[in-house]
Design a protein with these regions (language model features):
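A short helix-breaking turn/cap at a secondary-structure junction
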Residues: 26-36, 242-330
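Short glycine/serine-rich loop segments
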Residues: 148-280
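Acyltransferase
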Residues: 68-69, 100, 150, 300, ...
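Flexible, acidic loop-helix segments that line cofactor/substrate-binding pockets
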Residues: 90, 288-294, 313-314, 349-364
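Peri-catalytic substrate-binding/gating loops that frame the active-site cleft of hydrolases
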Residues: 54, 135-148, 154-157, 175-193, ...
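Active-site-proximal beta-strand/loop segments in catalytic clefts of secreted hydrolases
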Residues: 124-125, 165-169, 221-225, 318-320, ...
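Twin-arginine (Tat) signal peptide motif
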Residues: 1-7
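Short, well-ordered alpha-helical
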Residues: 9-10, 14-19, 26-142, 172-174, ...
Length: 367
C-alpha cells in the first residue's frame, strides 16, 4: 500500500482526531477551506519519491528546473493561496538558476549523487548564505542574512540539492513561552495542518511537516530539541527522524540546548529520509558533538533498508494511552497487530505517571 492510499484508508482520520485544536492561537480560517487533498489531480508530482524524480530526470521526462518550477507553482497554489497552508516563509529567488546549473552538470555527465537536482525546503532557524533570511520566525531577526551556510546546508548543496526555500516554525523553535502555539511565528503567522486546516500541525518544525505532507518539496529539513521533528511528522503521517545528537552538525543552527539539539529529515517515505540522511552526515570540526561522533556515521543509510527489519525488535508502547477515543484505540490495536505480524515484540511500558517528573528533569537540562 502506498502512502496516499494508506492515508485514505482511514489511518489519517485517526491521526487527525489526535491533533488538538488551535486553542488560544489567533488565526483566521481561510475563505477557501479546501485542503491540499482537493488539488491531487492537478499536481503531477504528487507523492513522487526522490528515486522517482531521479528516474524522470535521467530519462529526460523532466529537468531539475521543471521540477523546481512545479514545486514553486504548488507553493503559490495551496500555501500562499487556496487553503493558505502558510508553511513556507520565503522561496529562494535563485532556486531556478541553481536548478538550471545542475541540469547543465547532468548534461555534461556530472552527477553529484541521489540528491542531484532535488528541491528541498529547510526550517528558518538554519543559516543559508544566500538571498533568504534566517530568523527563527521572529520579527526581532527580520532582515538577518547569514554570512555562511550552516554545515548541513553546505552538505546539501555539495550533494546537488536545491534549497527551495525556508519553512515557517513555532517562533524560536517554541522556546519562548510555555503557552506558545505550535506553528505560529510573528514573521510568518500560523502554519496549518494540510489535512485539517483548523487543527494543530504540532511543532516546532510545523512548516517542514506541513510542506512535506502537502508535496511542496521532495523532502524537508526540521530541527528538534524535544519532539519538534517527531511530533509534526506524526500528525502529518510523515517519516520524521531525529538523529542521535552529534550525527549531524549543529553549526549554523540557532541553538536551544547543546545536549539535545539536532537537525533531521522529514519525508514521505523511509527511503527518501535515508537518502537525505546520507547526504547530511559528515564530521564538522566546529561542532564538538560532531567531532565526538566521528567514525560512527554511515555513508549510505539506504543499505540498511530491509522490509524484514522488524523481526526480533522490541517496541515499547504505553500501557495506558492518553485519551479515550474508541476509534483511535482501535487503530492503535491494529498497529500493534501489524507490528507483531512483522516479527516485532510489543512491550507495554508505563511512563505517563512519571511524565511530569521527567519533564522537570529535562527542563533543568534545558536551562
Amino acid at each position: 500500500m502506498n502512502r496516499r492510499n494508506f492515508l485514505k484508508s482511514g489511518s489519517l482520520a485517526g491521526l487527525s482526531v489526535t491533533a488538538a485544536s488551535l486553542v488560544g492561537c489567533k488565526t483566521e480560517t481561510p475563505k477557501e477551506t479546501k485542503t491540499s487533498e482537493d488539488q491531487e489531480d492537478r499536481f503531477e508530482l504528487l507523492e513522487w519519491t526522490i528515486p522517482q524524480l531521479q528516474e524522470a530526470m535521467a530519462s529526460g521526462k523532466y529537468t531539475a528546473a521543471a521540477i523546481t518550477q512545479l514545486y514553486i507553482d504548488r507553493i503559490h497554489a495551496i500555501d500562499k493561496d487556496g487553503p493558505l497552508l502558510n508553511s513556507v516563509l520565503e522561496i529562494n529567488p535563485d532556486a531556478l538558476a541553481i536548478a538550471k546549473g545542475l541540469d547543465k552538470e547532468r548534461e555534461d555527465g556530472k552527477l553529484r549523487g541521489p540528491l542531484h537536482g532535488i528541491p528541498i525546503l529547510i526550517k528558518d532557524n538554519i543559516d543559508t548564505a544566500d538571498k533568504m533570511q534566517t530568523t527563527a520566525g521572529a520579527l526581532a531577526l527580520e532582515g538577518n542574512i547569514a554570512s555562511k551556510d550552516a554545515f548541513i546546508v553546505q552538505q546539501l548543496r555539495a550533494a546537488g540539492a536545491i534549497i527551495l526555500g525556508k519553512t515557517n516554525l513555532s517562533e524560536w523553535a517554541n522556546f519562548r513561552s510555555n503557552r506558545s502555539c505550535s506553528g505560529w511565528s510573528s514573521r510568518g503567522g500560523q502554519t496549518r495542518s494540510p489535512y485539517l486546516l483548523t487543527h494543530n500541525p504540532c511543532g516546532s518544525s510545523s512548516g517542514s511537516g506541513t510542506a512535506a505532507a502537502a508535496n511542496l518539496a521532495a523532502i524537508t529539513i526540521g530541527t528538534e530539541t524535544d519532539g519538534s521533528i517527531t511530533c509534526p511528522s506524526s500528525v502529518a503521517a510523515l517519516v520524521g527522524l531525529k538523529p542521535t545528537v552529534g550525527l549531524l552538525s549543529r553549526s549554523g543552527i540557532i541553538p536551544i540546548s547543546h545536549t539535545q539539539d539536532t537537525a533531521g529529515p522529514m519525508g514521505r517515505t523511509v527511503t527518501d529520509v535515508a537518502i537525505t540522511l546520507s547526504a547530511l552526515t559528515a564530521t564538522d570540526q566546529q561542532d564538538p558533538a560532531s567531532v565526538a561522533a566521528k567514525g560512527k556515521a554511515a555513508k549510505d543509510y539506504t543499505q540498511f533498508l530491509d522490509a524484514k527489519s522488524l523481526a526480533g525488535k522490541r517496541i515499547g508502547i504505553e500501557k495506558k494511552p492518553q485519551g479515550t477515543n474508541h476509534y483511535i484505540l482501535a487503530l492503535l490495536d491494529k498497529c500493534k497487530a501489524l507490528l507483531t505480524a512483522q516479527g516485532a515484540t510489543i512491550v507495554e511500558i508505563e511512563y505517563l505517571d512519571k511524565i511530569d517528573e521527567l519533564g522537570r528533569h529535562e527542563y533543568n537540562v534545558l536551562k
